[in-house]
UniProtKB/Swiss-Prot annotation:
Pfam families: DNA_ligase_A_C (PF04679), DNA_ligase_A_M (PF01068), DNA_ligase_A_N (PF04675). This is DNA ligase 2. Belongs to the ATP-dependent DNA ligase family. It comes from Thermofilum pendens (strain DSM 2475 / Hrk 5). Keywords: ATP-binding, Cell cycle, Cell division, DNA damage, DNA recombination, DNA repair, DNA replication, Ligase, Magnesium, Metal-binding, Nucleotide-binding.
């Protein structure tokens, strides 16, 4: 065994191998429970981070930053092979982990063995692997590449073949276990608290403080009460509240108790802005730190009339000559790593704020929306043209709501967000519910609204598409079961450039069997960990015996499918797979489409 308070990395590698080989979600959770029970509390945080394929929570932005070429160089050096031989083997297999395992298992698999000297490898621990990976992530400036290579070489020389497989996959961000945060929460609750009530407490804490490593360590060392007492903190993003969708104004008002706050749904990038004095941090919908991309937005947020706050809004690109809002695609020019100042001048933005979650030491999530809106109105500077309140009005009539919706569309918005303003209109962190409802363009016989679906499988291309994917199997997310259910196979809408890019984009997520969280009747040629989200449009939503989305929910033996699906060209890198269109949204779209068709006939 490893040192006291540590865990041999081989134990982790053994569990990863078991998790990787199962297509059962329950088995995956059971393996995690067993792993967490075996892990000393001192390193439970590191085990959780490594299992997520990262070193720190998303919002800290710690990236390993190891390119494929650099990893291959390190492997060649560690195994005593020629770089070309290692590259050729990698081209054949496409899995650097498998290449490492093969090279380090083979006779002469290691530099000292290569020169005929037997070597006694010391046992690697989780702490040693984690520290080495952190050293690689933090290497910068002159000589950083050599530091990364040398650190990785030293790690691989001490690693057993199976350990090397997972170390290299981790380094390249290709662990491929596809374990959802919610599955880790299930396993932590079972391992350390053992009840459904405890699971709810842990999830609630996670929505306020989405750092699973930190929560795991707190739970293992100080217990459930310490986890339950976690508070919202400026600088740590909360999980954003999500919305359902409907397309009938009367039905929306009925769901929201007869009246609602209707608010423009801007075609921009959702942002959670944290202000503490003159310090401002910006986080995306995925909780990534995007402060660097928007130095102008940082300045706008500083103008808020408050010392400390967490506010939510939408960053929207606009035409400085006309003042008109520009579509989301224009905003993507702002996501550059370099020439940020140039992009800022070429693509100016405004921020439209729609919520406040925390202010001057007080959590506001339990306050109803109308009160939060009043607080927000007080802190936004009057007459400011860069940081503004979202355009909104209280409506209690279907005609008024429709008129407001048409006004929003004419001004370049996607539609309208309709929000409950009753006493129970709290801010539900991380939850999708009927307190917020998206009202977007009507789903007539042709599907005029897009959906965001997750790539779960692929089919080999033929002819012109040989060497890439001819079609992709797409799925919607079901939060009830934490699974991805298929809804279509899409092969149209991809440009030649897209097709060339698909293997590069998807192959890092390739796995040898259907992922445990994917529910599919269709057998794909290739399976992927659910990770990549694409925007899809189609002719209509129909019943289908082939797909599993809403299976048996509308008709026995049938699920929902999108007819004539087409990729719009928009990659939703801003969305985690769990933020994709849900099964319940597709059910509502189908019902709405059917109702509209009946009215038209």
């Amino acid at each position: 065994m490893g040192a006291a308070g540590d865990l041999p990395y081989s134990v982790l590698a053994d569990f990863y191998e078991r998790i990787e080989s199962t297509s059962s979600r329950l088995a995956m959770t059971d393996y995690l429970v067993a792993l967490f029970k075996k892990t000393p509390p001192e390193v439970i945080d590191k085990v959780v981070y490594l299992t997520q394929g990262q070193l720190r929570p998303d919002y800290e932005g710690v990236e390993l930053g190891v390119a494929e070429k650099l990893a291959l160089r390190a492997l060649a050096k560690a195994s005593g092979r020629h770089l070309k031989d290692v590259e050729d083997l990698y081209k054949k297999t496409g899995d650097i982990g498998a290449v490492a395992e093969k090279l380090l298992t083979a006779p002469g698999g290691g530099l000292l063995e290569f020169f005929g000297t037997p070597v006694q490898k010391k046992e690697l621990t989780v702490s040693q692997v984690y520290s080495a990976l952190m050293k690689i992530a933090q290497a910068s400036g002159e000589g950083a590449q050599e530091t990364k290579v040398n650190t990785l070489v030293a790690l691989l020389q001490d690693a057993k073949p199976k350990e090397a497989r997972y170390i290299l996959r981790t380094v390249l961000g290709r662990l491929r276990l596809g374990i959802a945060d919610m599955t880790i929460l299930d396993a932590l609750a079972a391992a350390f608290a053992g009840s459904k009530a405890a699971r709810d407490v842990i999830e609630r804490a996670y929505t306020k403080h989405p750092d699973l490593g930190y929560i795991a360590k707190l739970l293992a060392t100080k217990g459930l009460d310490a986890v339950a007492s976690l508070k919202i903190e400026v600088g740590i993003p909360v999980l954003p509240m999500l919305a359902e969708r409907l397309s009938d104004p009367a039905e929306i008002l009925e769901k929201l108790g007869g009246k609602c706050l209707a608010e423009y749904k801007y075609d921009g990038e959702r942002v959670q802005a944290h202000k503490s004095g003159d310090k401002v941090l910006l986080f995306s919908r995925r909780l990534e730190n995007i402060t660097h991309h928007y130095p102008d937005v940082v300045e706008y947020v500083k103008r808020l009339k408050v010392r400390e706050a967490i506010v939510e809004g939408e960053i929207v690109a606009y035409n400085p000559d006309t003042g008109e809002m520009l579509p989301f695609q224009e905003l993507m020019h702002r996501r550059r790593k370099y020439d940020v100042e140039k992009a800022m001048k070429e693509y100016p933005v405004r921020v439209y704020l729609f919520d406040v979650i925390y202010m001057d030491g007080e959590e506001l999530i339990e306050k109803p929306l109308d009160q939060r809106r009043l607080i927000l109105e007080k802190i936004v500077p009057e007459g400011d043209e860069d940081i503004l309140l979202s355009t909104a009005k209280v409506v209690g009539d279907a005609k008024d709501l429709l008129h407001f919706f048409e006004q929003a569309i004419s001004e370049g918005c996607e539609g309208v967000m309709c929000k409950s303003i009753g006493p129970g209109s709290i801010y539900q962190m991380g939850a999708r519910g009927w307190l917020w409802i998206k009202f977007k363009r009507d789903y007539r016989m042709e599907m005029t609204d897009t959906v965001d679906l997750v790539v779960v499988g692929g089919f080999h291309g033929r002819g012109k598409r040989a060497g890439t994917y001819g079609a992709l199997l797409m799925a919607a997310y079901d939060p009830e079961t934490d699974t991805f259910k298929t809804v279509c196979k899409v092969g149209t809408g991809f440009t030649d450039e897209d097709l060339a890019k698909l293997p590069e984009l998807l192959d890092p997520y390739k796995i040898p069997h259907r992922h445990p969280r994917v529910f599919s009747k269709i057998e794909a040629d290739v399976w992927f960990v659910p990770a990549v989200v694409l925007e899809i449009i189609g002719a209509e939503i129909t019943l289908s015996p082939l797909h599993t989305c809403a299976l048996n929910k509308l008709e026995e033996g049938a699920g929902l499918a999108i007819r004539f699906p087409r990729f719009t060209g928009r990659y939703r890198f801003d969305k985690k797979p769990e933020q994709a269109t849900t099964e319940s949204e597709l059910i509502e779209m189908y019902k709405s489409q059917k109702k509209t068709a009946l009215q038209q006939s």
